[in-house]
Every structure is written in structure tokens, then in C-alpha cells.
Amino acid sequence: MPFTASDICKIIFAVILPPLGVFLERGCNSDLLINILLTILGVGSILASMNPA
């Protein structure tokens, strides 16, 4: 399964701003809220790197 341009953009967004990466992948649901809270607490980057795309 090759990477597409949208996959690369999602990865970049997930590294820079983890909630945006989650929003692009999963939409607006509880995953986004959890990621926003974890980002505020400082662990959102770890969660984003562990989230399979």
C-alpha cells in the first residue's frame, strides 16, 4: 500500500499539530477531544506517533 500525497500531509500535520492530524484521519469525534486534551497536557505528540494511519 503506497503512500499518497494526502497521507504525507496527514503525517506532517500530525507531527506539527496532533489534533489536526486526528481530525483529518478520524473526523470530529471523541478521538479528537481526547487528543486535544492530551496535547494540552503535553503527550499528544506521543499519541499521534502511535496512532496507525
Swiss-Prot record:
Gene transcribed to yield this protein: PMP3
Domain of life: Eukaryota
Family: Belongs to the UPF0057 (PMP3) family.
Keyword Membrane: yes
Residue ranges crossing the lipid bilayer per the database entry: 32-52
Functional summary from the UniProt entry: Plays a role in the regulation of membrane potential. Could mediate a proton leak.
Keywords of the record: Cell membrane, Membrane, Transmembrane, Transmembrane helix
Cross-referenced PROSITE patterns: UPF0057
GO cellular component entries: plasma membrane
Topology class, membrane: Single-pass membrane protein
Alphabetized InterPro entries for the sequence: PMP3
Lineage of source species: Eukaryota, Fungi, Dikarya, Ascomycota, Pezizomycotina
Primary location group: membrane
UniProt organism field: Chaetomium globosum (strain ATCC 6205 / CBS 148.51 / DSM 1962 / NBRC 6347 / NRRL 1970) (Soil fungus)
Subcellular location: Cell membrane
Protein name: Plasma membrane proteolipid 3
